[in-house]
Amino acid sequence: MLVLKKAASSPFRGQGVTVLGMSAGVGKTAVSIGILRSLSRRGVDCAPFKAVAVVTPDEYAGRSLPPWRRGVVQSCTAAGTVPRWWHNPVLVNLPDARTPVGDLYVRGRRLGRVPVTGADRLDLGSLPDRLRRRCQDAVEEGYRRLAGEVPWLLVEGAAGAGDLPPAADLANRILPELAGLPVIVVASARQADPADVSRLTDRLTPALRALLLGFVLNRVSDHPAADAAAQRLARASRLPVLARITDAPPPLGYDGSPEKIDLMCEYRASCVDESGLMRLLDALPAARPGLVEATR
């Protein structure tokens, strides 16, 4: 059985952050890529960890890769590392964006077909007990392995935090609580509804709420409107808006191809650097995330 072991008795003294999203499509992967590439530029040994990913064939950047490597190909490129199963232990490969059933890969191996609920969401409660346990064990083992290898980890959630019941949400609740890293929540300036913020904070477990640093307002194009959105978010959540990332067109020459991923990573890093978010992350003290240890 796998149990949580507090990091006080572990040699790992890493830093890192967990990036969650208000909902699917707010740009948390773009923010994550920017953070990782900004760190990599400075020679920081960093890596992404995504407990669960859902991918489709129309995602051009990973089309030439085995399905189980597609979920973190851009984030791993940003960090200067090669995708391994422990960067993304659980992945569902859908045949297309309209079909809610796909192939489940755990530790890089196909284990059958499973349903998903909405964009990028795998509900543990919908799986048979055997598959549910295998998924959770793989996520805990993958995180433990990566935490022992890399001193700076970025844990990325999936879809929207609070969309699934806590006990069924590997990506946004179970793993982030195990990691124990500071949490930032990405919100889109185009859809920052205070009611959604209130629902989000109500749905998060007390342990996860205690880790929250604040919000990153993404896709900012109208600065007066962003000021108003930031004030609404702060009032609804009683948390600060840590940074605002400007909405800008993709870099010249980017066509979504695998060969141009590096160009996009540089672009994302520049956007994150300009927002001031990296100064805040640099100021965080060394974290002591919980580590998963195997016991009999």
Where are these regions (language model features)?
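Flexible phosphate-sensing "switch/lid" loops adjacent to ATP/NTP-binding sites
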Residues: 2-296
